[in-house]
């Protein structure tokens, strides 16, 4: 209800009057509507004499002040109240116009103030009497505008006061807000809150850069942690759109960095969906550069491996195979861990593959020369020495003892329980024993039970898979080649004692084929490991160095092992029966000077490991047109030739000594014939040059021609009569006949070649 007028002459002590104050919220143009007002109870004391004269219509009342419990008062203006913002009493005309307040926003046209007298509140809230203080007449109205409360957790701004609102608002539990660079302009306003607090907003625009962090503080002034799941990634397609809340990766993208993140295991993940075309192009270029670097490193590694493999010049296996393009492949099976090397030559027909069973004691000559300084080698093991009493006496050959010890020094390295090669050998042995034919070979042969009285006469070194397994578990094998040798010996004994066509012979052939296929993979892995362990990149002796060192003692017998009784095996002499020849009978106690058996000798000795190695090297150097002759020699008395994938494979371990020595004679005759051809070719060149000189001398009067001959490195000058043209033709005919005879003699036996050479040399002297 409206308040009654108060006469200036009447003093009413303690009179209280309830008034209603209407406050309107300012809104934008065209959207101005009357908002809900709130009632504020204000008990204002009007002391006596405050209003002077009613007739003068100069009613002046002090500015209304809230009770003390309202810390932030709201300053309002009536037509009869002084202007609180200026801090002075206004005395004007009888009807005072409204006084603007500095606290209200906008210009004069936007002011919304209640002009009539203030109406009393319909519902009054009780106030504390102690909080209502009487004001004195002479007391001036305070000119200071009350400040906004510090404890603010809600900001109310005009909807149209911001030019471009942010795309996504900050959440309550987010500490970082990225707003657009466009300034936020908000006029100064006095905003009311629900609990009676006020907040004054300055007119100055708020400018926040797109990368500036704005912290939102709650009512308790605590900064809450940001949760990544509440982040909203920024849309980078439109540069004009303001950014929302972004995660670390999106923030890095906005800053211009690559959208990459690294996992705990070191791998880098690239978010392709959140990248631009320019960033994708940069990533692609970087990946291509890194790929080129990796390819370069791989090429360098391959070149280095090729250089290391070039040192492998000893071959134990000659594997001449068919290539798809009709080429000849000669691959060497290197002992002591050297890799296989492939040499290609044109060869359009079926090829020959001759494999030599590697002896445990036989080691590459390179390893032998390296082991001459055992103290400097960390892989030198005294436990692998051969027994001295099993070798020739020291006075006969001291060098053979030291070299034989050194041959076994490095072979056993890297073969023991727990190694990869050991596990592979054990798995292969288990497969052979579990085969359906394996039961025949899993235990030693029961000679007495089966009544095989001649078994030990034919088979000198019995072996079975059960004994091999026991030796393998006890770590008695010093190298995987010893293991392979015993496995082969088991099946070779069965094939030797049981003729072809019997079941045991067929079983042995089947299991041996399975073993050879699996063993090739194990052996390749072992050779690869040994190549890096033994250090073959060191200075290796050249062939000229080996020739200066002289011949070395042949290795011990092939079948001398540390698995069973070595002394018994080494002391046995080979005993053969008519019609059957043991495959691995090697006599012991040989003298260093071993002579090659003659062609007509009935019982030829077995080749030593070194002799087989030399033979394989000579066979490798043969031209392609001589390989057919090798196949014919092997097929004469041997059935070990296998045709597989257009490749002829021959296991030299199963070839009898007679065939091996015949191959050796074939190589020797070829070398002799080659030397004769060279000598004849040199003579033919000299004769041709001499004929040219004679033809020139016929035109010029020259009584004699000079022939230079070198004997013992000294040049002697001889004066010979000039031959006639008929003599030159006769000499050329003799040269052609001698060259044809030497070529025909290359395929004959050694005795025939010797007679041919003597006859040809006699004809040369005449």
UniProtKB/Swiss-Prot annotation:
* SUPFAM superfamilies listed in its UniProt record: Bromodomain
One matching Pfam family, short form?
Answer: Bromodomain
Pinpoint the Bromo domain residues.
416-522
The free-text tissue note of the record is: Ubiquitously expressed.
Gene3D superfamilies assigned: 1.20.1270.220, Bromodomain-like
- What is the name of this protein? Transcription factor GTE4
Note on domains (UniProt): The NET domain could serve as an interface to localize different proteins or complexes to chromatin.
Main localization of the protein?
nucleus
What is known about what this protein does?
A: Involved in the activation and maintenance of cell division in the meristems and by this controls cell numbers in differentiated organs. Its action in cell cycle regulation may be directed through the RB-E2F pathway.
| UniProt cross-references to InterPro entries, sorted A to Z | Bromodomain, Bromodomain-like_sf, GTE_bromo, NET_dom, NET_sf
* UniProt xrefs under SMART domains: BROMO
Q: A Gene Ontology biological process annotation?
A: root development
Q: Keywords for this entry?
A: Bromodomain, Nucleus, Transcription, Transcription regulation
- Gene that encodes it: GTE4
Q: Which organism is it from?
A: Arabidopsis thaliana
